[in-house]
Amino acid sequence: MSIRTIKDCDFSGKRALVRCDFNVPLREGNITDDTRIKAALPTIEYLKSQGARVVLMSHLGRPKGEKNLRYSLMPIARRLSELLGQNVKMLSDCIGDEVVTAVSCMQNGDVVLLENVRFYKEEEENSDAFAMQLSKSGDIFVNDAFGTAHRAHASTSGVASYLPAVGGFLMEREDEFLGKILKNPESPFVSIIGGSKVSSKIAVLESLLPKSNVMVIGGGMAYTFLKVEGYSIGKSLLENEYIDVASSFLKKAKELSVEVILPIDHVVASEFQEYSMPEYVDSVNIPDSKIGMDIGEKTLKKIEGVLSSAKTVIWNGPLGVFEFDSFAKGTAKVAEYVANCPGITVVGGGDSVAAVNKFNLSGKITHVSTGGGASLEYLEGKVLPGIKVLEV
């Protein structure tokens, strides 16, 4: 099902109430990464060019439903002013008479930013009354916050009960690429799923399995699958309660003729510490006293081989403990292989996106998703409230 987008509306002289995801990292009031702010610019610039009066809203952090200036959007207003080359007026609230009055004084092409919507507990409660108050600042609701699309909050889905709702360019792009992965991936389709726990990734594994030709399983969760296959995993992470789940998953993969690639060699350590000495194990089996920390050279060669001919690739989750430099090589190499793959490549989920950015490869990926939990839930096949309200 497709979504309505900003191209479907006439915005001239209209108030566009835009939900963005400006939940950016701050240090002492300074923005340390403005990626999410820059991601919203195409939608904002387009609305300005169409003569809209652009009213932006977002959350920042977890202020727990109370006004807390530590979580004010003021630094975002300053950065937006720099990026847009015009004054972005920061309002002191997100609802109320003063906000409605300030918005009514806007000229076409003006941009204002409402204060943090999570200063009200009613935001996360998806309060109908709060959604109605927010809607008073707009004529058309534009949701461009894919990162919060999995949340049924007042500013992400509730407002759509009171205003016509469309998706911004960022939302449209996320829906297009992640939707293609789920509905119509071109073969050969390779899924690379990493991360530490089977429990947090089993839903996405099961969702992608019937569509995949090859599935690479790495990261900490791979050791539970290796244990099921009868291999020694030493002191590596093991989820005993997911042994049966992993076993039935591997059986289903065989029935569907999906090739599952698990690590065939490892980089290990004696302790799970950043400065532990890395050791190479040229075997599927890990010695009893060692912990698996990363995939080895032979596993990487195998992954490189399947990616060289892939037409579609989805990557979610790191293949090793990439936050420790000594155990980051596997994830770095896979990022490189995905970037060099000739097919459509999609990277989704916070950690794998962080890895792609860390190794400066995002420019070579077809689509790098901006949503962490939202990407994961989309790939699990769940209905996202923030997208559902935009569906045609």
Curated annotation (Swiss-Prot):
Q: Which CDD domains match?
A: Phosphoglycerate_kinase
Name the chemical reaction catalysed here: (2R)-3-phosphoglycerate + ATP = (2R)-3-phospho-glyceroyl phosphate + ADP
One example GO MF annotation = ADP binding
Keyword annotations: ATP-binding, Cytoplasm, Glycolysis, Kinase, Nucleotide-binding, Transferase
Where does the chain bind ATP? 201, 292, 323, 349-352
Q: Which GO terms describe its cellular component?
A: cytosol
Q: Does the keyword rRNA-binding apply?
A: no
Annotated pathway, please? Answer: Carbohydrate degradation; glycolysis; pyruvate from D-glyceraldehyde 3-phosphate: step 2/5
Q: Which residues bind substrate?
A: 21-23, 36, 59-62, 118, 151
Q: What is its EC number?
A: 2.7.2.3
What are the subcellular locations of this protein?
A: Cytoplasm
What Pfam families does the record point to? PGK
What is the superkingdom listed in this entry's lineage? Bacteria
In the record, biological process GO terms are: gluconeogenesis; glycolytic process
Quaternary structure and partners: Monomer.
- Which family is annotated? Belongs to the phosphoglycerate kinase family.
Q: What is this protein called?
A: Phosphoglycerate kinase
